Amino acid sequence: MFCATIAPLYSTDFGYLMPEKILIAVAWPYANGWLHIGHIAGCYLPADIFARYHRLKGNSVLMVSGSDQHGTPVTIRADQEGTTPEEVVEKYHLSFLETWDNLGISFDLFTKTGTSNHRETTHEIFNTLLRKGYIYKKIMTVPYCEHDARFLPDRYVKGICPNCDNQDARGDQCDNCGHPMNASELGNLTCRLCNQQISIRDSEHCFLSLSKFESDLKTWLSDKDGWRPNVLNFTRKFLDSGLKDRAITRDIQWGIDVPMQGFENKRIYVWFEA
């Protein structure tokens, strides 16, 4: 998956079309495993072809992406390999760079979410939304493993999806139907680390008021007839079912810190910051 923004520039003095500015924003791979042919065929090769085409036309192209280094995908891999999240992301980030070089994928910038600039930008966005009233605190129920004595965010739990009955849904989304959810909504909750039943505890988190954007998003979407039908229908389905406010912090120690007092032991949810 990649997004492209095209900005044509016209010369008012000579009346001809000047080179366009093309921004190609390519999906960020999680730095928790090796790339495979599906990654390349799915987004990186198409994006590279698009970039090369516009460079040949003489346009100014900026193709960017980076390693998604935070969240439970990385910490679970570290648990599996008996190492640290830092070592995991460094290993796989370097492997990504080697892959792009071997395949000739022509990124202008391939960065990572572990930079100080990314942290500062995330904090700036978080604080702006907080100041404007789009972020609020609320106590929610969170899975907790008594055996491992730890909270279990997102991919640390599995259970039955309430939307499609998939038996192996994750704690933040069902990969079978794409339905986003809180982990406590799953049926038959089980810890992925020890495969034991888990309990539910209260934990305070920050929520993003997605519901406040629903009306404006529907208006914005109303004239997007040029989108592919499946993309348009998928987006409309979420809006028609009603946007729900989502927790954007997690009980985890790996990730970007939350710029709020009382949240020192939590981190910003990877989908918010990446």
Residue ranges and their predicted role:
Residues 5-16:
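Short, positively charged and aromatic/hydrophobic N-terminal segments
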Residues 19-138, 149-150, 162, 226:
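N-terminal Rossmann-like or analogous alpha/beta NTP/dinucleotide-binding catalytic cores
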Residues 134-205:
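Cys/His-rich short segments
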